[in-house]
Amino acid sequence: MGNSEIRIQDGRTHFDVQKQVKKKKTITELREMRRNARPITWITAYSYPTATVAERADIDMILVGDSGGMVELGYKSTNPVTMDEMISMCKAVRRGAPKTFVVGDMPQGSYEISDEDAVTNALRFIKEGDCDAVKLEGGERVASRVKAIHNLSLIHISEPTRLRRI
């Protein structure tokens, strides 16, 4: 038993108990934390082992950054990182941190061409990568992409309840 583990009477460790009670933060909870100036813990991870440590440390959010192309895949820049590579890293992170809010970083070329591309690739992060949100860069020049993805999110969040009632 390591120094950081605390044994409970029935033999489980503190981490075993923590795994059972940890609940993934929702976007609403994260917004409330920000509004109330409560710290939000955030880490960048690209792999199962790192995500496992983040989950055990009760980190609020994990960013799966396109920098994983340099750190994990050996690229000289983030330019060559593909959607498939990002999805693979997101899946590994999700397996390691099933109860942590995961954000997928949309790589260069996955959203710049059209709103449709942005939505299609954002959906891949959500469906295939099992991410809770996506991140893209570009400020005002990508405002229409952000709006298209945001509109998708609103439909995605509100429709399942209606579908169950039909």
Residue ranges, per PLM feature:
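N-terminal glycine-rich anion-binding loops that anchor highly charged ligand groups
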Residues: 43, 52-71
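Conserved functional loop/turn residues at catalytic and ligand-binding sites
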Residues: 58, 66, 129-130, 161
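Active-site beta->alpha loop and helix N-cap motifs at the rims of alpha/beta catalytic domains
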Residues: 50, 76-145
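N-terminal amphipathic alpha-helix/helix-capping segment at the start of soluble metabolic enzymes
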Residues: 2-44
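Hydrophobic faces of well-ordered beta-strands that scaffold small-molecule active sites
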Residues: 41-44, 62-64, 102-106, 134-136, ...
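Single conserved hydrophobic/aromatic residue that forms the stacking wall/gate
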Residues: 155-166
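Surface-exposed amphipathic alpha-helices with a cationic face
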Residues: 22, 31-35, 55, 90-95, ...
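Short, well-ordered coil/turn segments that N-cap beta-strands
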Residues: 37-40, 59-60, 98-102, 130-132, ...
